[in-house]
């Protein structure tokens, strides 16, 4: 039995003073020795925290005693240690950043909820468009079979992508999904305000689908990206596969790294071997960038040799 747990949760509810709430909530979390990242806004709370089983259970009880969060659903993952290095509770304008000119309140308008078994049926329906509401790098390490991959790097780019591709979605039955459900609550509501009529969402997100006893994560390929130290977690309990491809050679890969150029910081899938071979950098420009954190640790001679090994050279200004 694991000694730690990771809790994923959200709740759209009114928080009158997010700044004061954040300060008091941070103190409570630290007292329980939790670590994680929580966003609070007037529209609600969105968080992921880790801690011992005892501490996380205490936290769930603590939240249940607040009428605003009494019915909040927690997605619980067993863990061997903390999934975060620190504890942050931050006030924000939104608990998910869609940055609309006219905000959408999921308590007033949102897509129909599909439970895991219903969502699986939708996956098998050729007349249904399954739309991934996550970022491209999340999709690349794992997604539902046949899902549409929007070419976006931030959630706030999704409405623009929809408008650019409206002709492919018009008059279609749309079912959307995300990690835990929070993004789809607002996004599916926006879809309805944007004129799409038949809009549904996976209730509880991928995390709930993967733990459902009926679906057991079936028809999910790869792993689910998470925004903590774990990076990705398994979902499919029936016939797991690897869909991620190494950025450098296209071989199967589920290991994410960040480009060593801090001005880039692009997330790429790469084996340990290729990380070393390509100096943990996504391009030649990033490899020779003066701020590169990986190459700073190399002597000029070693740097030159490593570049030559991949048929590259130092710029004349560096030589």
UniProtKB/Swiss-Prot annotation:
Biological process, per Gene Ontology: tRNA modification
InterPro entries linked to this entry: Rhodanese-like_dom, Rhodanese-like_dom_sf, Rhodanese_C, TrhO, TRHO_N
Keyword annotations from UniProtKB, A to Z: Oxidoreductase, tRNA processing
Keyword Nucleus on entry: no
Catalytic activity: uridine(34) in tRNA + AH2 + O2 = 5-hydroxyuridine(34) in tRNA + A + H2O
Highest taxon above the source species: Bacteria
Record domain Rhodanese: where: 124-218
Pfam families per record: Rhodanese (PF00581), Rhodanese_C (PF12368), UPF0176_N (PF17773)
EC number per UniProt: 1.14.-.-
Active site: 178
GO molecular function: oxidoreductase activity, acting on paired donors, with incorporation or reduction of molecular oxygen
Function: Catalyzes oxygen-dependent 5-hydroxyuridine (ho5U) modification at position 34 in tRNAs.
Family, per entry: Belongs to the TrhO family.
Protein name: tRNA uridine(34) hydroxylase
């Amino acid at each position: 039995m694991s000694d730690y747990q990771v809790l994923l949760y959200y709740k759209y509810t009114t928080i009158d003073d997010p700044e004061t709430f954040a300060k008091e909530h941070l103190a409570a979390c630290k007292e329980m020795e939790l670590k994680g990242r929580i966003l609070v806004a007037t529209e609600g709370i969105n968080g992921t925290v880790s801690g011992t089983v005892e501490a996380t259970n205490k936290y769930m009880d603590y939240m249940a005693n607040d009428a605003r969060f009494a019915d909040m659903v927690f997605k619980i993952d067993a863990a061997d240690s903390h999934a975060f290095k620190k504890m942050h509770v931050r006030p924000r304008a939104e608990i998910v950043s869609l940055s609309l000119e006219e905000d959408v309140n999921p308590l007033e308008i949102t897509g129909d909820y599909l439970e895991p078994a219903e969502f699986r049926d939708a996956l098998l329906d050729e007349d249904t468009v399954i739309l991934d509401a996550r970022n491209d790098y999340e999709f690349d390490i794992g997604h539902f079979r046949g899902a549409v991959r929007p070419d976006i790097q931030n959630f706030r780019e999704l409405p623009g992508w929809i408008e650019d591709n409206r002709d492919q979605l018009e008059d279609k039955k749309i079912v959307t999904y995300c990690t835990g459900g929070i993004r789809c609550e607002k996004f599916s509501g926006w879809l309805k305000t944007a004129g799409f009529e038949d809009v549904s969402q996976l209730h509880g997100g991928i995390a709930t689908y993967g733990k459902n006893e009926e679906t057991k994560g079936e028809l999910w390929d790869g792993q689910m990206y998470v925004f903590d130290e774990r990076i990705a977690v398994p979902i499919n309990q029936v016939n797991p596969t690897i869909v991620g491809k190494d950025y450098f050679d296209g071989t199967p890969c589920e290991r994410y790294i960040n480009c060593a150029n801090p001005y880039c910081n692009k997330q790429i899938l790469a084996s340990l071997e290729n990380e070393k071979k390509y100096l943990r950098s996504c391009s030649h420009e990033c490899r020779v960038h003066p701020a590169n954190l990986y190459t700073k640790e190399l002597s000029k001679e070693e740097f030159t040799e490593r570049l030559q090994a991949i048929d590259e050279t130092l710029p004349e200004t560096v030589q």
